[in-house]
């Protein structure tokens, strides 16, 4: 079974580095193991940049291994320097606690908990907060050489601009985590992003020095990159969150369906549980009939349903179809706000009602002549309905939820008109 797991991870492109490739494969063939991946609660929600390590952990669970999901309630008070060019701003304890609560709830969407072989959720504050300063320095610090720490990329990259002792010690805390989970839960493998290699190997080295433990390994996954060089995980509005209140299921769905042909197959391998035959079929469809965007639809549908559920996916598809067809009447005010979040927002005084004056005041048209031409030519739509009368007066019936009106000029240029 585990040979199949390794083959699947390799086919999906999910293995970047391993501390001991042959020993890891032998271990996975020999027994069902416990393994872990962690996340610090830097916000009250995960974003899609967190997804890949945890989805990889979930793949281990699908093959019979037991995942340990670690929320860094302790390390989150310190701050990981990995991948950061400057010092993190420390959060208050209350902030960290609230973030732990939010992220813990999201983990229940990603993993199966509560069974004999279900995932285990832990918070490293439970043990790190019990270590005294004297114990930290004597029992742990004595086994970690400064030269060894200075050799870590996460430390080296910060030396020129400066790094606090607080963040300098972070790698020791994560090393303590691995040792604790190894002793208490027989955890033998840590999975993380490629930026976590230094922290993972620190844990393995600490266990070797403190306990003579050699059966502890690390596996990292690649940094997710896009073919156009842009950073993965960002939309025009910013980070793409798993929290539906921060990024609506519709926006989430749109993020995935808008992935390019160059990236979509890689992302299907990374972020879905579709099998090899189905992904190969979707790749063939992309190559032969790219206009159908079947691969993008499969990606968006699978990831959205996995994170938000079937009902939210159905709503996202319904909103998308209505916006594409221009059938705005079928959508609620809330859904329209979601759909038009990124279009130009313009303000209109409630005294202005004639359609020509509205187009001028909002800047949709630059002159009365242009406004009249647009209306006469059928280029202006009010809430999805074409308006060709230059004498048309906007009324309260044109105000959605008594707040806004959607005006379209031409085929695709939308504006959200808010009343002041």
From Swiss-Prot:
In UniProt terms, what function does this protein have?
Catalyzes the attachment of tyrosine to tRNA(Tyr) in a two-step reaction: tyrosine is first activated by ATP to form Tyr-AMP and then transferred to the acceptor end of tRNA(Tyr).
Q: Give the UniProt entry's GO cellular component terms.
A: cytosol
Query: What is the annotated localization of this protein?
Result: Cytoplasm
Kindly give the Pfam families that the UniProt entry links to this protein: SYY_C-terminal, tRNA-synt_1b
Q: Which reaction does it catalyse?
A: tRNA(Tyr) + L-tyrosine + ATP = L-tyrosyl-tRNA(Tyr) + AMP + diphosphate + H(+)
Keywords in UniProt for this one? Answer: Aminoacyl-tRNA synthetase, ATP-binding, Cytoplasm, Ligase, Nucleotide-binding, Protein biosynthesis, RNA-binding
Q: Which family does it belong to?
A: Belongs to the class-I aminoacyl-tRNA synthetase family. TyrS type 1 subfamily.
- Which positions does the motif 'KMSKS' region occupy? 231-235
- Domain named S4 RNA-binding: which ranges? 353-420
GO biological process annotations for this chain's record? tyrosyl-tRNA aminoacylation
Q: What is this protein called?
A: Tyrosine--tRNA ligase
Q: Which SUPFAM superfamilies does this entry report, sorted A to Z?
A: Alpha-L RNA-binding motif (SSF55174), Nucleotidylyl transferase (SSF52374)
Please indicate the residue ranges that the annotation assigns to the motif 'HIGH' region. 41-50
PROSITE patterns, per the entry? AA_TRNA_LIGASE_I, S4
| UniProt keyword rRNA-binding, yes or no | no
EC number(s)?
6.1.1.1
């Amino acid at each position: 079974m585990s040979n199949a797991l390794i083959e699947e991870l390799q086919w999906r492109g999910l293995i970047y580095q391993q501390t001991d490739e042959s020993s890891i494969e032998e271990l996975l063939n020999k027994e069902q193991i416990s393994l872990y991946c962690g996340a610090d609660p830097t916000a009250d929600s995960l974003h899609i940049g967190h997804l890949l390590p945890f989805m990889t952990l979930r793949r281990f669970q699908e093959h019979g291994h037991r995942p340990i999901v670690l929320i860094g309630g302790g390390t989150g008070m310190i701050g990981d320097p990995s991948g950061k060019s400057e010092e993190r701003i420390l959060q208050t304890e209350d902030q960290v606690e609230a973030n732990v609560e939010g992220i813990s709830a999201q983990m229940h969407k990603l993993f199966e908990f509560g069974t004999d072989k279900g995932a285990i959720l832990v918070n490293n504050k439970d043990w790190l907060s019990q270590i005294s300063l004297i114990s930290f320095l004597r029992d742990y610090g004595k086994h970690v050489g400064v030269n060894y720490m200075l050799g870590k990329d996460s430390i080296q990259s910060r030396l020129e601009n400066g790094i606090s002792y607080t963040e300098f010690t972070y790698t020791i805390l994560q090393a303590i985590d691995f040792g604790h989970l190894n002793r208490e839960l027989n955890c033998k493998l840590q999975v993380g992003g490629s930026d976590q290699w230094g922290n993972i190997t620190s844990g393995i080295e600490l266990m070797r020095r403190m306990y003579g433990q050699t059966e502890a390994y690390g596996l990292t996954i690649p940094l997710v990159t896009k073919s156009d060089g842009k950073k993965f995980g960002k939309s025009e509005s910013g980070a793409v969150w798993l929290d539906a209140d921060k990024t609506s299921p519709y926006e989430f769905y749109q993020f995935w369906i808008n992935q390019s042909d160059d990236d979509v197959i890689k992302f299907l391998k990374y972020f879905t549980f579709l099998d090899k035959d189905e992904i190969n079929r979707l790749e063939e469809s992309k190559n032969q009939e790219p206009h159908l965007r079947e691969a993008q639809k499969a990606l968006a549908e699978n990831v959205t349903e996995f994170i938000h559920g079937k009902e939210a996916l159905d709503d996202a598809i319904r909103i998308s179809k209505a916006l594409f067809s221009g059938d705005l009447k079928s959508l609620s005010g809330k859904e329209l706000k979601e759909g038009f979040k990124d279009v130009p927002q313009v303000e209109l005084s409630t005294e202005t009602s004639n359609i020509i004056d509205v187009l001028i005041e909002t800047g949709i048209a630059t002159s009365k002549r242009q406004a009249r031409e647009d209306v006469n030519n059928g280029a202006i739509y009010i809430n999805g309905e074409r308006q060709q009368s230059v004498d048309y007066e906007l009324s309260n019936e044109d105000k959605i939820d008594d707040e806004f009106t959607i005006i379209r000029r031409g085929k695709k240029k939308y504006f959200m008109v808010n009343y002041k």
